[in-house]
Amino acid sequence: MGTPATLDELAIKTIRGLSMDAVQAANSGHPGTPMALAPLGWALFSKLRRHDPAHPDWPDRDRFILSCGHASMLQYSLLHLSGYALSLDDIRNFRQWGSLTPGHPEHHVTPGVETTTGPLGQGIGNGVGMAMAERHLAARFNAPGHELFDHRTWVIASDGDIMEGVASEAASIAGHLKLGKLIVFWDDNEITIDGSTDLTFSEDVLARFSAFGWQTLSVDDGEDLVALSEAAEAAMADERPSFIRVRTPIGYPAPNKPTTSGAHGAPLGEDEVIATKQVMEWPTEHFFVPDELATAAESVRDRGAERYADWQKRLDAYRAEHPEAAAELDAALSGELPEGWDEDLPTFDADPKGLPTRKASGAILNALASKIGGLVGGSADLAGSNNSQMKGLSNFLPDADGVPRNVDWGIREHAMAAAINGLALHGGVIPYGATFLVFSDYMRPSIRLA
């Protein structure tokens, strides 16, 4: 029971067991997707993703977003098994008031959760923003011999995520910008609450994302750890954002409810939980975690600690060679504004003719932009009317020179708002977006999550 393959198998079975048990104990939740995605989740957290459980706020960590937030027990199980500050008792308290394991992941509640998800599609937009933040920070602070920012954003999305309009808006601009460090896994289980996706969903999704400018890949068996890792490696090697279709049977390996909507949004039932554990050759004990998995968690922690220590060495060398830039970096990451940021702001005398507030806003924005290097944003195709362009600064474009700061969002208000949330959550930047007030209705779901 000590080989890596066996540890992987134990971890996958543990994730499935915890997901069933937690939802059953809470008498509420979504067991089927965490069960089906256990191999993918474990591959990400144990092998592919660069992260350090002891330092969940490490600036150069890979970000992970569970866009299908209803599958939260997948993320909680992975955080626990990887050594984050989330105990087995926390998992036992799934969906209980005041617990660290709410029904959907919440950024400000649970260590290791990068963004609040639940409303489908938002996580894809958040991921676009995080990938944009990485590009901005790399252009602003990386120097020859000192690569401080070089990380990826991994997203797991469901059929429902892919149907939502915000996902298409976000995928469109991500492809246009060639955000090659954004990788989205699509859990193609062909099931929604109302039944098979045949009822509602018939387009060629891979062709759609290919048209958006993404690399598209496919893994036909979501249980195949080798195929999952190979697809991820191919994604990491491409300059385009990558969209990986993963076929999974929801609820696997439950003997009576797999591949049905019955495994989606309700407890399996105690009899089905026991039957599933028997199929897995797993103890029927609730919340069982084998002792052997301590070795797997230690491996994740050790690898993370090594990578974090290496980054700290690079940061120390950067401080010695570029002290002024390092001070700017510290301020950016802590959210501090530079000294004198509010000096010399324009003032506006009373004028009987009146001054449009958008013109005053534009003048102040440009005064701030000259002093706050992390100010990043733009308008949804209304820059001239909103006066939201920062003059003389580089735009976010695939081959732009300089530090990208102006964003031409296009007519994508919803994606703009979701990406702004991702930019803000990533840290190191101060994002903004602009449109007409009446069009802000298109942004409302993301504004609520902000």
Please provide the spans of the model-predicted regions.
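Anionic-ligand anchoring segments at beta-strand to alpha-helix junctions in alpha/beta enzyme folds, i.e.
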Residues: 85-112, 195, 206, 212-215, ...
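Non-catalytic terminal/interface segments that mediate subunit docking, oligomerization
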Residues: 313-449
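Glycine-rich ThDP/TPP pyrophosphate-binding loop and its adjacent helix/strand module
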Residues: 53-54, 109-110, 115-299
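Active-site nucleophile and cofactor-binding loops and adjacent substrate-binding regions
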Residues: 26-38, 64-70, 95, 105-126, ...
